[in-house]
């Protein structure tokens, strides 16, 4: 509300000034009321009338009090209007109190005044608009206002109830003096509501000296600002509480923080270094202690691979995997085995090598044959040989496998893929184990020796199979005829005799073979490949057994074990 000078408020914008023009019409009303009760009027002028018996029940009001906070611009005609309106409309009587006069409502007097014949005749001679206003002023202060000309009858429930009635006008009320105390600095005003206004009536208050020193505009501005701020704070608090309750309905019982999704309580295992895992994934609910770790975890859901290899087209999610992959191009192997000196690209590969090759700790024995293994997965694979379970089927030839990796290696036979090349001679292999065995031909390194005969082998699996010759162990029996074999590959060949299965077809001539090694040897006849060459004369052969027979002809040739691609 803008600050307005008190003189301007009483001059142009005051609602009392709009009624000044109608004050001449109200003289007839006051004369009629005085003629109906002439005796009461004379007693009132002489000051001897009983205050209780006075039909108007009001003392004369003086507008020339110098203690008022603003000058009154109205003349004697307004005084007449004030006397008549207060006498006919208020129906109140003064009560003797110490120092000042107080007022009490008398609804019976108001009803009697409204129903008097003189008042009815006087109101009937007035215009309808003015009579409507006077009747609105004669209602008790506690009643709700009637509907205005615009038909709006609902009272504004958000009206400011603590607006002091001491300032003259705010566009909704008409103010008139109630009484003037004999003591200096004490005065009070009565606010008459305008008919048709949608404001609730304010409570009557006594005008204090502190209020008298302030201007009406400043008082109204302060009150409205206070109410506006209080409603604003309440609305913001309600929206904040309601929005938070709707968006974050789950609250921690210990810390008081609110969350969008429920989660189980944190256990000691879910904290690292005493720090709670506060950053939870929105998709799977997994929590982390640091925001950066959560951002890296989100790549698993989005499929983002920001680490691109500069040598090939492969990309990786984690920087550690990217560094390990780079070592395959550079040939770096920073993890050597302390027992045999073999180096590895990954530390996990070194641990696996030490566990499989150099460790004698094999706590997982097979209940069927007693063979021990160093990890439960190896035991599970071995037990499938006894049970005959082969859950992995090749989609090309319907061949079944007990291990998924064996099926992947088998599918390379159909596709012709050989992803493991020899860095020395360039020969490619379908299995990494076959490449390792082939590389021993170039290096001559055979670190695994038999304790019985002293024969050395490049792979520990070769040593294990060789030791079965001395022990006579045959751990792979046939489920149909009961015949046992020392090697699993030999058992597979034998089982194909019973089934008659030949799942390996030659793409050139259509000939079928039972095992992949036979198909590989057959394909060499079509492409002319001769990978087995005699070191003495340089003659090459398609099969390793042909090379062995050729060496037998040379007296100086030594018979060396040739690795077979079909053996495990």
UniProtKB/Swiss-Prot annotation:
Q: Where do Basic and acidic residues bias regions lie? A: 1-11
Main location (coarse class): nucleus
Q: Please give an example of a GO cellular component term from this record.
A: nucleus
Fetch the SUPFAM superfamilies from UniProt. beta-beta-alpha zinc fingers
Task: Enumerate the subcellular locations listed in this protein's record, separating them with semicolons.
Answer: Nucleus
UniProt lists the family membership as follows:
Belongs to the krueppel C2H2-type zinc-finger protein family.
Report the protein name in the record: Zinc finger protein 648
- State the organism of origin: Homo sapiens
Q: Give the gene symbol.
A: ZNF648
């Amino acid at each position: 509300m803008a600050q307005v000078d008190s003189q301007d408020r009483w001059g142009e914008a005051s609602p009392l000034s709009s009624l000044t023009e109608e004050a001449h019409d109200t003289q007839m009303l006051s004369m009629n009321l005085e003629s109906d009760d002439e005796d009461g009027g004379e007693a009132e002028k002489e000051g001897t009338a009983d205050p209780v018996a006075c039909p108007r029940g009001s003392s004369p009001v003086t507008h020339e009090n110098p203690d008022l906070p603003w000058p009154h611009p109205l003349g004697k005609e307004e005084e007449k209007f004030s006397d008549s309106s207060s006498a006919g409309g208020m129906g109140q009587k003064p009560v003797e109190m110490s120092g000042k006069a107080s007022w009490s409502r008398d609804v019976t007097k108001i009803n009697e005044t409204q129903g008097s014949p003189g008042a009815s005749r006087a109101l009937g001679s007035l215009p309808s608009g003015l009579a409507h206003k006077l009747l609105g002023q004669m209602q008790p202060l506690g009643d709700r206002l009637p509907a205005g000309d615009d038909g709006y009858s609902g009272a504004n429930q958000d009206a400011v109830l603590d607006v002091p009635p001491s300032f003259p006008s705010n566009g909704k009320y008409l103010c008139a003096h109630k009484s003037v105390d004999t003591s200096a600095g004490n005065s009070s005003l009565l606010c008459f509501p305008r008919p048709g206004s949608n404001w609730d009536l304010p409570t009557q208050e006594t005008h204090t000296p502190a209020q008298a020193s302030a201007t009406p505009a400043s008082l109204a501005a302060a009150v409205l600002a206070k109410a506006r701020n209080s409603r604003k704070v309440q609305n913001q608090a309600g929206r904040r509480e309601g929005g938070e309750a709707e968006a974050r309905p789950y609250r921690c019982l210990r810390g008081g923080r609110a969350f969008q999704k429920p989660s189980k309580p944190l256990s000691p295992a879910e904290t690292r270094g005493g720090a709670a895992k506060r950053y939870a994934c929105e998709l799977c609910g997994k929590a982390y202690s640091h925001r950066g770790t959560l951002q890296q975890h989100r790549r698993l859901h989005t499929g983002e691979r920001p680490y691109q290899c500069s040598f090939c087209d492969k990309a990786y999610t984690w920087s550690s995997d990217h560094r390990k992959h780079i070592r395959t191009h550079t040939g770096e192997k920073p993890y050597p085995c302390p027992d045999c000196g073999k180096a590895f690209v990954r530390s996990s590969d070194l641990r696996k090598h030490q566990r499989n090759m150099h460790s004698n700790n094999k706590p997982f024995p097979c209940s069927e044959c007693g063979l021990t293994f160093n990890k439960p997965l190896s035991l599970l694979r071995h037990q499938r040989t006894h049970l005959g379970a082969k859950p992995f089927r090749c989609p090309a030839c319907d061949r079944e496998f007990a291990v998924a990796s064996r099926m992947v290696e088998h599918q390379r036979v159909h596709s012709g893929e050989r992803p493991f090349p020899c860095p020395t001679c360039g020969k490619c292999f379908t299995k990494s184990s076959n490449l390792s065995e082939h590389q021993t031909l170039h290096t001559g390194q055979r670190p695994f020796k038999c304790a019985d005969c002293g024969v050395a082998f490049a792979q520990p699996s070769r040593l294990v199979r060789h030791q079965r010759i001395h022990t006579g162990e045959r751990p792979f029996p046939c489920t149909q005829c009961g015949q046992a074999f020392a090697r699993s590959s030999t058992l597979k060949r034998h089982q194909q005799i019973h089934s008659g299965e030949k799942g390996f077809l030659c793409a050139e001539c259509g000939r079928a073979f039972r095992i992949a090694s036979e198909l590989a040897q057959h394909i060499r006849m079509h492409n002319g490949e001769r990978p087995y060459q005699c070191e003495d004369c340089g003659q090459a052969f398609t099969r390793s057994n042909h090379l062995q027979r050729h060496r037998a002809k040379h007296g100086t040739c030594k018979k060396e074990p040739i690795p077979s691609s079909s053996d495990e």
